[in-house]
C-alpha cells in the first residue's frame, strides 16, 4: 500500500485529498492500494476568506462530511515535527499522545499566519487570522454596548491597509453601526497608500469607498504602543479605542522550517512546476506554504484562496500520479482576479496582475457574495460532486452579473 499524507485541512489540503482520491478511483484502485490521510488540528475546514464578517462560527465545514464519504482517513492532531529523511510526521493528539505518521508522499498544505508584533500592549490586539481570533473579536464587539461609556468605546483602529485590513475596516463600519450611531473606524498604514500591494488599478474605488463610509485613513504612520483603551501612533497621535485589529503582515506556516529547502521572504517553500519542493524528495507543497509560479503570467502566485484551491488540486493529482508512475501535470492557475469586499460600500473586482478594475460597488458585491457563499465551499455529503470538482483542470464557473458588465471567469 502506498501512503499519501496531507498536512492541513484548509482549501489546499482538502482539494489535494479530493484530487488524489479522484485519480485513485479513475484507475480502479481502492484505499488498500493508495491510502490518503489528512492530519489537521481541528475538525473543520475554516472558510478563512470570510472571517472579516460577523458571526464567524458559521464559517466552517466539517471535514468528515467532505472527505469521509470519499474514503479519506483523517487524523485529529497538531503537527509538531516533520522528518523528511525518515518520511514521518509527528502530531500531538488531543489526549496528549503523539502519533507518528509515515508517508510515501507528503503534501504540506498548512497555510499561513499573521505576524503579530512585539509591541507594548500587544496582548490587547485582535486579529481575524483564525476562527478563534475572529470569534474573539466578534464576541468583544457584541459586548461593547455593555461597557462603560467612554470616548473610544465604539472606535476601532485597524492596522494594515492591505487586502485583509481593507475588508475588516470597511466591514467594521456596518458592524459598529448596528451597536451605536456615533462610530469611528481608523485605518493605519505605514506606507503612503492604501492597498499598497494592490497597485493603482483599484485604488480610486477603494479610496472612494473609504471616504463614503467615513473611514479615517492615516498613512505613513505605524502603531507604537497600545493599552486596553487607547493606542499611540508613531507620529505621537493618541487615539482612544476599545478595539484594535492587527492585519499587517503574513508568513507561511512555521512547519516549513522542518523542510530543508529554499524559502522566499514570506517563508514559502521553493517548488517546481509540479509543486514538488525543490531538493527534497517525496515532498510537495500547496497553498500558502508554496512559492508557486504561474507560468502563463510569469508571477509567483499570491497567498490567497484563489490560488490555494488550484494548487491543492494539482498537488493532490501529482502526488497520486507520482506513486502510480504516471506523468505529472504542470501547475497552471486561472488568470489572476481579485475581489475585494468594501463593506457597505460594495466591492471592487480586478483582473490581471495590473489589477485593472472590472466591477465596482454593488455589482461587484454580488460577485463577492457568490464567491464567498458558494464557490469556495466544497460539496458536503456529496462525494460525486466533490470528485467532479476535483482534479487539476476542474474550472470555476462563469459569472453572469446583473447589469452591463461583461461576465468574468474567476
Annotate each PLM feature.
Residues 72-157, 245:
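FAD-binding core/adjacent interface of flavoenzyme oxidoreductases
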Residues 12, 111-114, 250-251, 345:
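Short glycine-rich anion-binding loops that position phosphate/pyrophosphate groups of nucleotides
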Residues 17, 306-333:
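Internal hydrophobic alpha-helix adjacent to the cofactor/substrate pocket in enzyme cavities
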Residues 138-182:
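Rossmann-like NAD(P)H-binding beta-loop-alpha module
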Residues 1-76, 167-198, 245, 408-410:
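Beta1-alpha1 glycine-rich phosphate/pyrophosphate-binding loop at the start
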Amino acid at each position: 500500500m502506498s501512503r499519501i499524507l496531507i498536512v492541513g485541512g484548509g482549501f489546499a489540503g482538502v482539494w489535494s485529498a479530493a484530487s488524489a482520491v479522484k485519480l485513485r478511483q479513475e484507475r480502479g484502485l481502492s484505499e488498500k492500494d493508495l491510502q490518503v490521510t489528512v492530519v489537521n488540528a481541528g475538525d473543520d475546514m475554516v472558510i478563512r476568506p470570510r472571517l472579516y464578517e460577523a458571526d464567524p462560527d458559521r464559517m466552517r465545514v466539517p471535514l468528515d462530511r467532505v472527505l469521509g464519504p470519499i474514503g479519506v482517513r483523517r487524523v485529529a492532531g497538531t503537527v509538531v515535527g516533520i522528518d523528511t529523511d525518515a518520511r514521518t510526521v509527528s502530531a500531538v493528539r488531543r489526549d496528549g499522545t503523539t502519533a507518528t505518521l509515515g508517508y510515501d508522499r507528503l503534501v504540506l498544505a498548512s497555510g499561513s499566519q499573521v505576524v503579530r508584533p512585539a509591541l507594548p500592549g500587544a496582548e490587547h490586539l485582535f486579529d481575524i487570522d483564525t476562527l478563534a481570533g475572529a470569534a474573539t473579536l466578534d464576541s468583544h464587539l457584541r459586548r461593547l454596548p455593555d461597557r462603560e461609556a467612554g470616548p473610544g468605546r465604539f472606535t476601532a483602529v485597524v492596522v494594515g491597509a492591505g487586502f485583509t485590513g481593507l475588508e475588516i475596516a470597511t466591514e467594521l463600519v456596518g458592524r459598529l453601526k448596528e451597536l451605536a450611531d456615533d462610530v469611528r473606524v481608523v485605518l493605519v498604514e505605514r506606507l503612503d497608500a492604501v492597498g499598497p500591494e494592490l497597485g493603482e488599478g483599484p485604488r480610486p474605488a477603494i479610496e472612494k469607498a473609504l471616504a463614503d463610509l467615513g473611514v479615517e485613513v492615516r498613512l505613513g504612520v505605524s502603531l507604537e504602543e497600545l493599552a486596553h483603551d487607547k493606542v499611540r501612533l508613531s507620529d505621537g497621535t493618541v487615539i482612544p479605542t476599545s478595539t484594535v485589529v492587527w492585519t499587517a503582515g503574513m508568513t507561511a506556516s512555521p512547519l516549513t522550517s522542518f523542510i530543508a529547502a529554499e524559502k522566499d521572504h514570506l517563508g514559502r517553500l521553493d517548488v517546481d512546476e509540479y509543486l514538488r519542493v525543490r531538493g527534497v524528495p517525496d515532498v510537495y507543497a500547496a497553498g500558502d506554504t508554496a512559492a508557486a509560479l504561474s507560468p502563463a503570467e510569469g508571477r509567483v502566485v499570491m497567498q490567497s484562496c484563489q490560488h490555494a484551491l488550484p494548487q491543492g488540486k494539482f498537488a493532490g493529482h501529482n502526488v497520486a500520479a507520482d506513486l502510480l508512475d504516471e506523468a505529472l501535470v504542470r501547475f497552471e492557475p486561472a488568470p489572476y482576479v481579485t475581489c475585494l469586499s468594501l463593506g457597505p460600500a460594495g466591492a471592487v473586482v480586478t483582473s490581471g496582475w495590473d489589477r485593472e478594475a472590472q466591477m465596482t460597488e454593488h455589482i461587484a458585491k454580488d460577485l463577492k457574495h457568490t464567491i464567498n457563499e458558494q464557490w469556495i465551499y466544497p460539496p458536503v455529503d456529496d462525494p460525486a460532486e466533490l470528485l467532479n470538482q476535483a482534479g487539476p483542470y476542474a474550472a470555476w464557473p462563469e459569472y453572469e452579473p446583473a447589469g452591463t458588465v461583461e461576465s468574468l471567469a474567476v
